[in-house]
Amino acid sequence: MTNQQKFDRLRKLLDEASVYARAVGKLEFDMQCCAPKDGMEQAGADMAVLSDRYFRLTHTKRYAQLVTELHADSDGLTQVQKKVIEHLYEAWEKEKNIPAKLNYEMSLAYNRAYSKWLEAKQAADFSMFSGALAEIISYTHQALDLREQKKPTYYDALLDDTEKGGSISQLDAFFDALRARIVPLVRRIQTEGKPIRTDFMSRPCPISQQEAFSKYLLELEGLDKEALVLMTTEHPFTTNFGPKDVRVTTHYYENNFVSNIFTTLHEGGHALFMQNEPEEFYREHAANSMTNGMHECLSLIHI
């Protein structure tokens, strides 16, 4: 069997697994944007079942064999396919020792935690969320302990997951350098800066007008409105289920319209990536594979 034939078989496995991943994502979107409070527990349970199915499909012996063999020898594959194998292998190495039961329990814990976090945030009472957070931390430590390639600390491992190569020492050096420039600048502004009018920024602005302006901003950024939806949530985010189904969220404050403007422009920046990635990326399961740093930094340029 050629390497291309192996990749074709792997793609079929990923095609099926991706159906479950999209289903989980759509349930999560609904839970964060429109699900009634009393329906969140059921949504979380449904998501855990679907996540378990995805996990099992990507942890079969056949899947592992294809990924490891193609990682060892990728001759004949396209550059995009080689990058896909690189990402899949890295994920496999991190997750291969996690039992399905632990993964299922982690999914349940994360889903339960969201509703707890929402209640705590709205009540401004951290104690309402602390128990759920402690449970998540415990499960995270269990999963990290199962990895064969260890990092100096749990936090180092999570930083590397978020941004490949990230570490505490790297960020300490970065923030030390940033602090050396930023602190003097802030002090200079405080002592020498001219007063700037800000009273208009808290002027009441009807939510309906903010929503209409948000839609205008998204069109101004060049987004395809027929492949886009705009909704509200407690903490804004952008997600997608292919280039033709991109979902942007924002949060309106009647007395802080500027917050929504910045949010919409930034989330619209994420949406631009999602709508414009090459079709090949989606076909070969390479979409959304850029680093978080790239996604966030370039999306912020639109503000």
Predicted regions and their residues:
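Active-site recognition of the HExxH zinc-binding catalytic motif
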Residues: 259-278, 296-299
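Divalent-cation-assisted or electrostatically stabilized phosphate/pyrophosphate-binding catalytic cores
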Residues: 287-293
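Conserved small/polar residues in nucleotide/adenosyl-binding loops
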Residues: 301-303
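Short, extreme N-terminal leader segments that mark the start of a protein/domain
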Residues: 1-10, 255, 280-281, 289
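Contiguous, non-catalytic segments that form substrate-binding/exosite surfaces or channel walls
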Residues: 106-257
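Short acidic (Asp/Glu) and glycine-rich catalytic loops that position anionic groups and cofactors
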Residues: 24-31, 88-90, 193-194, 244, ...
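An N-terminal structural lobe/cap that precedes and organizes the functional/catalytic core
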Residues: 214, 243, 263, 274-287
